[in-house]
Amino acid sequence: MRPAVSVITPFAGADAELDALIGRLEALRAGPEDDLLVADNRPRPAPGRRGPVEIVAAAGLRSPAFARNAGARRARGAWLVFVDADTAPRADLLDAYFTPPPDDDAGILGGGIRDVVDRPTRVARYVVDREKLDPRHALGHPHRPFFQTANCAVRRSAFEQVGGFAEAARAAEDADLCWRLQDAGWRLEERPEAAVEHRARETLGALLRQLAVHGAGVAWLNRRYPGSDPGPSLRQLAGRLSWYPRTAWSRARRGEREEALFVLIDLLALSAYDAGRLRSNDARR
């Protein structure tokens, strides 16, 4: 028997998106001791129950971290499973997280994340090709590994021990939580079979806005954990402006037109990410 879990999803979208999210959560194979929670982070939340899904009011700071903490306070389970609103979990997600049972010192379990194309735009194909949310990127972080809150499970006692998410953070709260858990003696365990599909961004504007938010998050992390991600040097920035256009031109001359475009998007993506480092990551501002 696996432990009781609480599935928590932060939400800040439109009503139609909420309907679709509830449908995806209803498809999970959940037991009678599990609860399915949507933490409604909109300015005017709509708390209540929709079938097996409870919508929890999470008005206040506009940040996923704030919403997840609000959901965690309502949760009953021994484990808190966090999935994002733009993901589609596999029906067996909850069972897969606990097969095999986690070790006693495992504080957080990281599931699989696969980008998928909803509308086959060039940008969506780029995101899938570059595997932007592949968990290997987070696990290979030069400071310390972490799991992404797009899909992870946290032991409730460990979560409460470290005080939950830094709820004023707009981004990078997942790395911060994982690093505080490791500082407290908890281990990370991978659960790649506990998988979700993540809907790839479909437009260049949406992708660049997302990356700018992530850039603000890593700059915030670097202030909290000095040296964890100091950003590129001026020499590295200058090198990009030369290498990426030359590489794109070379690919185009060989007839690899889509890959040439992808290389140019790489440059724009890096630029948005680095520009985002200049922005505040504080939802109170």
Summary of predicted features, one role per range:
Residues 23-33:
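Short, acidic, metal-binding catalytic loop of nucleotide-sugar glycosyltransferases
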Residues 38-48, 87:
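A conserved acidic beta->alpha catalytic loop
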Residues 58-75:
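Glycine-rich, basic loop-to-helix element that forms the pyrophosphate-binding segment
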Residues 80:
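Short aromatic/hydrophobic "clamp" motif used to bind/position activated sugar donors
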Residues 92-122:
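Conserved donor NDP-sugar-binding/catalytic core segment of glycosyltransferases
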Residues 112-113, 127-144:
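Short, flexible, basic/aromatic active-site loop/helix in glycosyltransferases
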Residues 170-177:
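Acidic donor-binding loop at a coil-to-helix junction in glycosyltransferase catalytic cores
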Residues 212-216, 228-285:
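Non-catalytic, C-terminal membrane-associated alpha-helical segments of glycosyltransferases
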